[in-house]
Amino acid sequence: MSLIPSSGKARWAIKVCVITGCLMVSGALFASRFVIGVNPQSGLGCIDANLLLIDKADTTPKKGQIFAYRAMQAEPIYSNGTLMAKYLAAVPGDTVEVTRDYRILVNGQEFTRGLPLLIDVPVDELDRFIGRRTLQADEYWMLGDKPRSFDSRYWGPIHASQIVGRGYVIF
């Protein structure tokens, strides 16, 4: 009895098994490095993206790039641990300032402006959102490029341990 299949059906079945196995291994390798992220803030217009490919292997912060992170200060708007993606606007050593006229400056350069999500905050509480700070080691300032973005201008910097990976816009 030969172990080599002689019929066309048997050869076809072997090919299907090999292709299926290759697809499963490829899928597992892809999933171990990448995750698909859906922008939960699409209605707020935070960044021009609804779907992102997140590279979990690329966690080295680079200013100006989109990074996904686990939000830990976004309650009650979003649960702690919610995956978010924003532009990395400032890195350790950078100075971030939110001015009285609601301009957001990074090292003196305007990144964006506005704090529209504070419309219902009493005037006497607005001062806690205004100020200047120099980011410490492992602190990163995440900003959307739209005024209505819910980002670091409202809850401060994130820690390096919150970064999941670099985001690439799919659409």
Regions found by a protein language model. Name each.
Residues 1-83, 99, 153-171:
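Protein maturation boundaries and topogenic segments
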Residues 42-45, 88, 96-97, 132-133:
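Short, exposed beta-strand/loop patches in secreted or surface proteins that constitute
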Residues 53-55, 89, 134:
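Generic structural detector for well-ordered beta-strands
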Residues 79, 83-111:
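Mid-length scaffold segments of soluble, non-membrane domains
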